[in-house]
Amino acid sequence: MEKLEQIVNEIEQLTVAELAELVKMLEDKFGVSASAPVMAMPVAGAAAGGGAAAEEKTEFDVVLKSFGAKKINVIKVVREITGLGLKEAKDLVEKAGTPDAVIKQGVNKDEAEEIKKKLEEAGAEVELK
């Protein structure tokens, strides 16, 4: 039990980018996926209408594509959104354009749009995946 608590304490110390990398490493190591399984639900209108209905995505990752000309403003907003320290937020912002530049993972559409709006107002270019 003490060993598990120690592992949890170590994980708490990681930054968002480090956590994302840890998840990728665990997925590769054990051949699993950390994403929640999606259950296929029959759509009543699709069978009757004969058309395929596109399933709307419910969880989004907010990815920083570019921090633009106002890097300091973007760092401030990233700190506000993530709760990271100054150095961690700066490191995350400087990873803009890479797969590690995930600001938030698995958020609902409204929250993702709100985060995107805040970052774009600060001068960043953001993508929702």
Swiss-Prot record:
Belongs to the bacterial ribosomal protein bL12 family. The keyword Kinase does not apply. PANTHER family: 39S RIBOSOMAL PROTEIN L12 (PTHR45987), LARGE RIBOSOMAL SUBUNIT PROTEIN BL12M (PTHR45987:SF4). GO terms for molecular function: mRNA binding; structural constituent of ribosome. The keyword Ribonucleoprotein applies. One of its GO terms (biological process) is translation. SUPFAM superfamilies: ClpS-like (SSF54736), Ribosomal protein L7/12, oligomerisation (N-terminal) domain (SSF48300). This is Large ribosomal subunit protein bL12. Forms part of the ribosomal stalk which helps the ribosome interact with GTP-bound translation factors. Is thus essential for accurate translation. One of its GO terms (cellular component) is cytosolic large ribosomal subunit. InterPro entries: Ribosomal_bL12 (IPR000206), Ribosomal_bL12_C (IPR013823), Ribosomal_bL12_C/ClpS-like (IPR014719), Ribosomal_bL12_oligo (IPR008932), Ribosomal_bL12_oligo_N_sf (IPR036235). Keywords: Ribonucleoprotein, Ribosomal protein. Pfam families: Ribosomal_L12, Ribosomal_L12_N. Homodimer. Part of the ribosomal stalk of the 50S ribosomal subunit. Forms a multimeric L10(L12)X complex, where L10 forms an elongated spine to which 2 to 4 L12 dimers bind in a sequential fashion. Binds GTP-bound translation factors.
